[in-house]
């Protein structure tokens, strides 16, 4: 299967560079097995039934971008990919020349780091300040907006590039389907009898990496840390037994749940809790084990995420839906509109 089969041309004007004024003010495309319809996000309450289980990703985006210079004076930009411990991180480092081991960095005029190792494209940096890294980032870091938003981060992004139910710090990109939910709509869903649970997947910067091969089977997926606790496994079993639906909010929730299912299949067991790195790559032909419907935003052309959605709802259905979204001027990507998709697999 070729990457080019997932290509579409998007007018620049349809890239959402700012969120809507209210979280729930986005539009919602409903891609059902019978066709598609155009709704408002608030209509999602009518699409989810009592007894259905909504599963969210409760990761918290850390202000992971730091700007500054090397001791030599050269400009440098650090994007933290993963926190190792309170004083060590794995990071992407952009500079005119890659820093050598022992190179010291002064970031945001206050943060001192030293390059102590390298893992492929990532650098291991040691924080020299006495405070723990999370405290430093909350004080000095910039929100790591995706490259296509193409503007400096603003104070408002600290709230809006974050779900209202975020809990566990560690992501460097938001689980964007969740950005549409506010406390009011969550209460409406719970009052209706919809059940909710939370998984964790710390979204890495790799989520924005383009697929650089022609044949998708040759693509090496980036790795991210995911958690599916036992209470989520139990809630899924209860939902399935009752004949209700498991609905994932976002591709990161999908990947967490399907990673747990894949591990269970490999171990020859029933679905079990999962606390591990995952590099699961879902593309057409994949048979979903857990989810019956999903909420997601509109994704980049030729990305692994549009491949995942195509695996869930059928490639032709998804690519046609994207053309319709462009014709109807939906807003795309992280701060854009959403889709509610029902599983459509042979």
UniProtKB/Swiss-Prot annotation:
The keyword Hydrolase does not apply. Keywords: Cytoplasm, Queuosine biosynthesis, S-adenosyl-L-methionine, Transferase. One of its GO terms (molecular function) is S-adenosylmethionine:tRNA ribosyltransferase-isomerase activity. Its main location: cytoplasm. Gene3D superfamilies: QueA-like. It catalyses: 7-aminomethyl-7-carbaguanosine(34) in tRNA + S-adenosyl-L-methionine = epoxyqueuosine(34) in tRNA + adenine + L-methionine + 2 H(+). Pathway: tRNA modification; tRNA-queuosine biosynthesis. The keyword Ligase does not apply. It is an enzyme of class 2 (transferase). One of its GO terms (biological process) is tRNA wobble guanine modification. InterPro entries: QueA (IPR003699), QueA_dom1 (IPR042118), QueA_dom2 (IPR042119), QueA_sf (IPR036100). It is found in: Cytoplasm. SUPFAM superfamilies: QueA-like. GO terms for cellular component: cytoplasm. It comes from the Bacteria. Its EC number is 2.4.99.17. Transfers and isomerizes the ribose moiety from AdoMet to the 7-aminomethyl group of 7-deazaguanine (preQ1-tRNA) to give epoxyqueuosine (oQ-tRNA). Monomer. Belongs to the QueA family. This is S-adenosylmethionine:tRNA ribosyltransferase-isomerase. It comes from Pseudoalteromonas atlantica (strain T6c / ATCC BAA-1087). The lineage of its organism: Bacteria, Pseudomonadati, Pseudomonadota, Gammaproteobacteria, Alteromonadales. The gene is queA.
């Amino acid at each position: 299967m070729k990457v080019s089969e997932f290509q579409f041309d998007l007018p620049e004007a349809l890239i959402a560079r700012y969120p809507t004024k209210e979280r729930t003010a986005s539009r919602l495309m409903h891609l059902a097995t019978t066709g598609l319809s155009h709704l408002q996000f608030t209509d999602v309450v009518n699409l989810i039934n009592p007894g259905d289980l909504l599963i969210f990703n409760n990761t918290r985006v850390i202000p992971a971008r730091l700007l500054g210079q090397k001791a030599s004076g050269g400009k440098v930009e650090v994007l933290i990919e993963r926190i190792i411990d309170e004083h060590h991180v794995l990071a992407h480092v952009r500079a005119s020349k890659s820093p050598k081991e022992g190179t010291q960095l002064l970031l945001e005029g206050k943060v001192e780091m030293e390059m102590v190792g390298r893992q492929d494209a990532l650098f291991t940096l040691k924080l020299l300040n006495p405070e723990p890294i999370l405290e430093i980032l909350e004080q000095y870091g910039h929100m790591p907006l995706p490259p296509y938003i193409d503007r400096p981060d603003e104070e408002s992004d600290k709230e809006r590039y974050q779900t209202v139910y975020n809990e566990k710090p560690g992501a460097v990109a938001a689980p964007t389907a969740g950005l549409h939910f506010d406390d009011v709509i969550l209460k409406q869903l719970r009052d209706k009898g919809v059940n909710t649970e939370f998984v964790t997947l710390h979204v890495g910067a790799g989520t924005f990496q383009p697929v650089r091969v022609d044949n998708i089977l040759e693509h090496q997926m980036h790795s991210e840390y995911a958690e599916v606790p036992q209470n989520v496994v139990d809630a899924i079993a209860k939902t399935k037994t009752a004949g209700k639906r498991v609905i994932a909010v976002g591709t990161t929730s999908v990947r967490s749940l399907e990673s747990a299912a894949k591990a269970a299949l490999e171990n020859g067991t029933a679905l079990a809790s999962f606390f591990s790195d995952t590099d699961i790559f879902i593309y057409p032909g994949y048979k979903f084990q857990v989810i019956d419907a999903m909420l997601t935003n509109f994704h980049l052309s030729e990305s692994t995420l549009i491949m995942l959605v195509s695996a869930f709802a059928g490639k032709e259905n998804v690519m046609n839906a994207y053309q319709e979204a462009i014709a109807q001027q939906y807003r795309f990507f992280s701060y854009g509109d959403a889709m509610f998709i029902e599983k459509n697999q042979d």
